[in-house]
């Protein structure tokens, strides 16, 4: 049987790797959730490409210290915590967690690191309200397309009006 120290060292290395590779890491207090609710949350996370893991707070603090994240300290990392690691979309973990919290008020956002910057709970909630990248691109394209469409309708109306005057 392997020594507990070796196992803990491997877990710390795993957390360090996830913190370095991820564009976002959001810490949440999941106290009071049932197994079914946590399973549902994990499924939503997996579908969005987000890792949702529960680690011992002491191991998270060690890993955060290795990476240089001083905010993951004794004051904030207490209780039943899980971390959602986002890789492609830095806002995805916050968005999914906030959506889940709307129907499961027992869960609480604590803090997060998004693209190297520390955010408290209120900033993470603000970030969660930002639409997804796809929605923002669609809105941008819609606003770019609108003037062209309006111009085309205007030209068409002028052409129809000119045809009406020629017939008279």
UniProtKB/Swiss-Prot annotation:
One of its GO terms (cellular component) is large ribosomal subunit. GO terms for molecular function: large ribosomal subunit rRNA binding; structural constituent of ribosome. GO terms for biological process: translation. Keywords: Ribonucleoprotein, Ribosomal protein, RNA-binding, rRNA-binding. Forms part of the ribosomal stalk, playing a central role in the interaction of the ribosome with GTP-bound translation factors. Belongs to the universal ribosomal protein uL10 family. Signal peptide: none annotated. Part of the ribosomal stalk of the 50S ribosomal subunit. The N-terminus interacts with L11 and the large rRNA to form the base of the stalk. The C-terminus forms an elongated spine to which L12 dimers bind in a sequential fashion forming a multimeric L10(L12)X complex. It comes from Clostridioides difficile (strain 630) (Peptoclostridium difficile). This is Large ribosomal subunit protein uL10. Pfam families: Ribosomal_L10 (PF00466). PANTHER family: 39S RIBOSOMAL PROTEIN L10, MITOCHONDRIAL. InterPro entries: Ribosomal_uL10 (IPR001790), Ribosomal_uL10-like_sf (IPR043141), Ribosomal_uL10_bac (IPR022973), Ribosomal_uL10_bac_type (IPR047865), Ribosomal_uL10_CS_bac (IPR002363).
